[in-house]
Amino acid sequence: MIQKKINLFLIAFLFFAQSALGDYTARNDVKEFIEFMHEKYDFEKTYLLEIFGRATHQEKVIRIMNRQPEGTMTWERYRAIMVNDSRISAGKEFINQHREDLKRAENIYGIPAEIIASIIGIETRYGRIKGNIRVIDSLSTLAFDYPRRAKFFKTQLEEFLLLSREENFNPELLEGSIAGAMGYGQFMPDSYRNYAVDFDKDGIRDILNNPVDAIGSVANFLNKKGKWKPNTPVAIKANATKEINSIKSTFKPYMTSLELEKIGLESTETIPGNLKLLPISLDLSEGYEYWIGFDNYQSISRYNRSKLYVMAVFEFSNALSEFL
């Protein structure tokens, strides 16, 4: 009997604890955010109170955000997940369907068609996996219940509400990733506002359901935010001529060819021009794989600041290039 009462108490406690987490309108930090949105952007307070009154805390968002699988994942394993026959087959189909759109984006923005197709394939398998968590829930959870990155996600929540108003979206219906990224290319709200384009000229910037707009938007992002340099490589394979000590953790090229040789890296191809170079070390199950990165390596990193991600996009793009 005592155990039964304890169990009932625990159930009730968990229920009310979860309810408190979800009752965002009762919290001072949320009230302050609502006041900020009202004062700065003239949002109606009653409207925002209704939105946040129905927003719910998503504990799984916190749980997944706290995981960092890439930190312990080898390049071999990551590449096998991201660049495989299934994804390449889907990429071939996407290219066949949107060849003209990809080429048009390449001509306008200077981004290789295979890079555009690669990013959309890596991000969502060409729209098959776009995320199924309400964006208002994920961003509210991360803005108000994830102190480590609260500042960033508060900005994204602000951008999301502005985006919804500007594009006439219902903010309670949009779904995305655990971090609030949306659509074919998984744009965060600020990227949607700043870089999404109406590439099919139908009057709507729809990267949520329109692959043509997504193609143009990914290209525009890499052109403007990525500062892509046409006719410049992403990376070239390298060999180690001696034991290499720790490599600086950065995405910005900072070395000359001579400096690379001094630390023990030798390119397997001729390096074009007098370019700044980046030594790249990828963990394998045994040893390391070495590459030399260029400015366009940094360009892709502005989409996702992970060297595994950048290299997966690059290698996948090489596989897709034969279909263009």
Kindly give the residue locations of the regions a language model identified.
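Sec-dependent signal peptide recognition
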Residues: 3-11
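N-terminal signal peptide c-region/cleavage motif recognized by signal peptidases
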Residues: 12, 17-19
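An acidic, Gly/Ser/Thr/Pro-rich helix-cap/linker signature
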Residues: 23-97, 103-106
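A contiguous strand-loop segment
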Residues: 29, 36-40, 47-53, 154-175, ...
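Solvent-exposed loop/turn segments at secondary-structure junctions
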Residues: 55-56, 123-127, 181, 241, ...
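Acidic/His-rich structured neighborhood in mature extracellular/periplasmic domains
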Residues: 80-217, 223
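Flexible, glycine-rich surface segments
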Residues: 171-285
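C-terminal functional modules
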Residues: 272-324
